[in-house]
Amino acid sequence: MSLKDILTLIAVTAALVAAEPSAFADKLEEIIQSGVIKIAVPADFPPFGSVGKDGQAEGYDVEVAKLVARDLGVKLELVAVTSPNRIAYLLTGKVDLVISSLGANPERAKVIAFTDAYAPFYLGIFGDAKTEVKSAADLAGKTIGVTRGTIEDAELTRLAPKTATIQRFEDNDPTLSALASGKVDLIATGSAAAGSLARKSPGKAEKKFVLRDSPAHIGVRKDEPDLVAWLNVFIHYHQKPGGELDALAQKWLGESLAGLPPF
């Protein structure tokens, strides 16, 4: 029996046991029968997802999406999204999954379901090495850039002093560019994005302090437990040391998935 057969059998069996008699037409089976899966990936958030020099999508999330499609035995359609629109694309049926460095929080959990974590990630405040900031209190009087609708946006809004100015951008590229060009004093963003900027512009994206640990999860519509179950099997099967997810994480993120908590 192939890996795809094993993963499919486990998930379908679990879903059927819990399903109502009228609910046998589940999403996992629908995807397999259609032969196509549409997955949202970031277009502006390296190393998770961006457009390469050849014009093609590349990054950790892109390769995870390819691995999902391969194990399901279906054709992959990648759909480029930004942080503000990725959940809307899922809820309106434009995509089947969101693999876009998506952090989980109670507010998002009201409208979508999450798998176990598939990538390490933390959110922080970053800025020029010459800017002295060690805590939220030090943000007073500073201008901080952040991508609208992200978890770091919510955390920054909660923690920033009243005298801080929060400048919001519609996606990640302008947020990073604002720091690189000096339009803002600091940015709130993910560790991977800040690392990408630091490699291009040494000294521009020094970590000041951590806002919160926020591992990435795959987003799925609610009431699709069969698909969530299959994806969790997929994640745990491939994240073990030497597994394909672990290898991708080391390639793109420079980190192993060993010890990654499920949530």
Where are each of the predicted segments found?
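Bacterial N-terminal signal peptides
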Residues: 8-19
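Extracytoplasmic small-molecule ligand-binding "clamshell" domains
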Residues: 25-101
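Ligand-binding clefts/hinges and TM-proximal coupling segments of bilobed small-molecule sensing domains
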Residues: 27, 151-168, 202-207, 235-263
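Bilobed "Venus flytrap"/periplasmic-binding protein-like clamshell domains
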Residues: 38-47, 57-71, 124-170, 186, ...
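Periplasmic-binding protein-like
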Residues: 43, 119-127, 195-235, 255-263
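Extended ligand-binding regions for polar small-molecule ligands
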Residues: 62-71, 137, 142-143, 149-151, ...
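Short helix-initiation/N-cap motifs at beta->coil->alpha
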Residues: 77-88, 167-177, 181, 214
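A ligand-binding cleft/hinge motif common to bilobed small-molecule-binding domains
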Residues: 85, 101-110, 155-158, 180-212
